[in-house]
Regions:
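Intrinsically disordered, low-complexity regulatory segments enriched in Ser/Thr/Pro
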Residues: 78-107
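Short glycine-rich, basic-tinged beta-strand/loop micro-motifs
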Residues: 20-25, 131-150
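Ampiphathic alpha-helical segments that act as solvent-exposed interaction surfaces
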Residues: 39-43, 47, 101-126
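Short, conserved charged micro-motifs
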Residues: 32-42, 103-107, 147-153
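Short, extreme N-terminal leader segments that mark the start of a protein/domain
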Residues: 3-6, 13-45
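Short glycine-rich, low-complexity/disordered patches
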Residues: 53-67, 122-141, 168-172
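N-terminal low-complexity, intrinsically disordered segments
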Residues: 28-84
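Short, hydrophobic/π-rich interface segment
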Residues: 144-170
Length: 172
């Protein structure tokens, strides 16, 4: 057995944070009543057949809708997972990067937004869903490189601001 030290870990350095690649981006659906959850399985299978998301090797679909608060329907790719989940009671498309991506942290953040928005656009084309692009969640899923603390936020915020400013020019 290994002793677990529960003391507060020191904040990650900005240099380490900039190596983080496990980026999560989620955009929410405007009206979840426009689709039944079980429809995502067939939709995601068609994406696999067409390899519909650029720069992603789409592999499998897993349906976890029977789990309350679970990940919903998951499209597994080598590089990342896409899932239609109802986290916090809100249906949305979540992109969870698993593999490192090229470029600096800002490039990886842009890549996460781009991949998630490509998935949203594809779902809008394949269904009656519409996504709210003015409301999203961004997370870094790496407790070592990006602990959830004010220092991490301060290091990430300028990169996130750059991405958001390019996506939404002339907005505050």
């Amino acid at each position: 057995l290994t002793y677990l030290n529960h003391r507060r870990h020191p904040p990650a350095s900005s240099a380490l944070l900039m190596e983080a690649h496990k980026i999560i981006v989620k955009f929410f659906v405007e009206d979840a009543s426009r689709i039944r959850g079980e429809q995502f399985v067939a939709i995601f299978h068609s994406w696999i057949q067409q390899q519909a998301i650029p720069e992603h090797l789409l592999i499998d679909v897993v349906d976890y809708q029977h789990l309350s608060g679970g990940p919903g329907t998951v499209l597994v790719a080598h590089e990342a997972n896409f899932s239609m989940d109802r986290e916090e009671g809100r249906l949305g498309l979540m992109y969870v990067r698993k593999q490192p991506a090229n470029g600096d942290f800002g490039d990886r953040l842009r890549q996460g937004f781009r991949a998630c928005l490509q998935g949203c656009a594809r779902l809008e084309a394949d269904t009656q869903l519409r996504f709210k692009t003015n409301d999203c969640v961004v997370r870094l899923n790496d407790r070592l490189l990006a602990p959830n603390n004010p220092e991490t936020y301060a290091a990430v915020e300028p990169h996130l601001r750059t991405v958001v400013d390019k996506l939404y020019p002339n907005s505050d």
